[in-house]
Regions:
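Gly/serine-rich nucleotide phosphate-binding loop at the start of the catalytic core
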Residues: 2-106
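Positively charged, low-complexity nucleic-acid-binding target-recognition regions
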Residues: 2-28, 32, 316, 320-439
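Substrate-contacting helices/loops that form the catalytic groove of nucleic-acid
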Residues: 65, 69-96, 100, 177-181, ...
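Acidic carboxylate diad motif detector
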Residues: 80-187
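Hydrophobic residues embedded in beta-strands of well-ordered beta-sheets
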Residues: 147, 152-155, 191-194, 222-223, ...
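Short acidic-glycine loop/turn motifs at beta-strand connectors
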Residues: 150, 187-189, 226-229, 355-356, ...
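Secondary-structure transition/turn motif
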Residues: 153-164, 196-201, 228-229, 374-376
């Protein structure tokens, strides 16, 4: 399917939709929060949930195949209503009678998610939707009509007994929880999780500090701030690379389809999970500290997908988690009344003297310190870049003050090339997502 098809129509309506969404979010004073905790289904529940996962995959893959075939044959799209009618026809098919053995809600949600995925694709925010495999993470989404949570006891549709889970938030009363959606998932390492999506009261904005900070992200140091602080790069994957490689070699030696291969695959998945967890913890600590200590946070719109094409730096860049760090800054600034400004990726922050504004013609990546030929000021490359980022961000914030919801950023898909002569780029600005959690 061509990437440009329908994109202009989506772009015309998307700003209005975003504006209505964030106005509603701010006016209502609520934010959507996801609480993810371990689940412990018994054997009967596991069998029921695995059947549900399989039915979700069948519905998703068949619907996606029908969308692709219709586009290639007729050059027309497929609406959600048409996929809903197709699901009804699937349930009447004798070969697909097993679809009636599970709750219909996860199947309907699969259609909704696919419809949203195509909207994101046509708007240029996501890749083309792919077919689902039984080898990856599995999940089923239940809305209010398909579950009940009373007194901390969770019951799912088509389940004969309550689903046992461990609540890990002692300051939140699970018996008073009123989730809008429950997501049951099975990770590749064999762990079960249940996620409660709840609309909660928005927290009070943090007290003003009067501080603004520019953040220069890198590989040698994860981040350098405009006030000279350096956040060391812990290199989580590199520290555990030997252990992970050992498990991967064992997996490669196992025969396909064997029980030993399944065990080895689970060990590889567990090793990846440990790396992912420590990275998430580090990013949360770093982002929370910046949000607490500063009113305005300025970062660059890094093109991570393009940067990882460098084979020598791809693993190190991916290990940093810059995209996840930005996502956390976005929703935390939104929630706690801070302002996040994202300046253009082409802004020459490293080559510009933060003292006099002189712009160097060239500056190699290996040059970590340099002297300005105009004012003779001596610069640390990263600190100078962070100071220029802060100056550009404060100019943007001054010219386009944030809305009542807190942070303002430009959406990652709308960067514009700035001339090096324009040292204060004016990026387009959009709202910040308020969703939290890994689901």
């Amino acid at each position: 399917m061509p990437r440009d098809a329908g994109r202009h129509g989506e772009r015309q309506v998307r700003p209005a939709r975003l504006r209505r969404f964030y106005e509603k979010t701010c006016d209502s004073g609520t934010v959507r929060t996801a609480y993810r905790c371990r689940a412990y289904p018994d054997e009967q529940q596991q069998a029921m949930l695995r059947r549900t996962f399989g039915c979700v995959r069948v519905v998703w893959n068949r619907t996606l195949a029908q969308r692709r075939a219709r586009w290639h044959l007729e050059r027309t799209g497929t609406s959600y209503a048409e996929t809903d009618r197709a699901l009804t026809a699937m349930k009447k098919d004798p070969d697909l009678a097993f679809l009636n053995q599970v709750s219909s809600v996860p199947l309907q949600q699969a259609l909704r998610h696919q419809h949203q995925a195509f909207r994101g694709f046509f708007a240029g925010r996501a890749r083309y939707p792919r077919f689902k495999s039984r080898a990856g993470r599995q999940s089923a989404h239940y809305t209010r009509s398909a579950f009940s949570l009373r007194g901390g006891v969770l019951r799912l549709a088509k389940a004969a007994s309550p689903l046992r889970f461990t609540w890990t938030w002692p300051d939140i009363d699970v018996t008073a929880l009123d989730p809008a959606m429950v997501i049951v998932s099975l990770e590749s390492d064999g762990r079960w999780y249940v996620t409660f999506t709840v609309d909660t009261q928005a927290p009070e904005p943090l007290p003003q500090t009067g501080r603004a900070v520019g953040v220069d992200l890198g590989v040698k140091d994860f981040a350098v701030t405009s006030d000279g602080q350096r956040i060391a790069n812990p290199r989580h994957l590199e520290r555990r690379a030997q252990n992970l490689a050992r498990y991967q070699r064992r997996l490669a030696r196992c025969q396909n389809g064997s029980a030993n291969r399944a065990k080895a695959k689970a060990k590889v998945a567990r090793a990846h999970r440990k790396v992912r967890n420590v990275r998430q913890d580090f990013l949360h600590r770093a982002s929370t500290r910046l949000v607490r200590e500063n009113d305005i946070i300025v970062i660059e719109d890094l093109h991570v997908a393009g940067m990882v094409r460098n084979r020598r730096l791809a693993r190190a860049i991916s290990d940093c988690g810059w995209g996840e760090f930005r996502r956390q800054l976005e929703y935390k600034c939104q929630r706690y009344g801070r302002e996040l400004v994202v300046i253009d990726r082409w802004y020459p922050s490293s080559k510009t003297c933060s003292a006099c504004g002189h712009l160097l013609a060239e500056l190699s990546l290996s040059t970590r310190h340099w002297t300005c030929p105009s004012c003779r000021a001596r610069h640390d490359r990263d600190i100078n870049a962070a100071q220029n980022i802060r100056a550009a961000g404060r100019a943007v914030a001054r010219d386009a003050p944030g809305d009542a919801c807190g942070g303002d950023v430009r959406h990652s898909g709308s960067s514009r090339v700035q001339s090096p002569a324009n040292q204060e780029p004016q990026p387009a600005r959009a709202g910040i997502p308020v969703f939290q959690g890994g689901e």
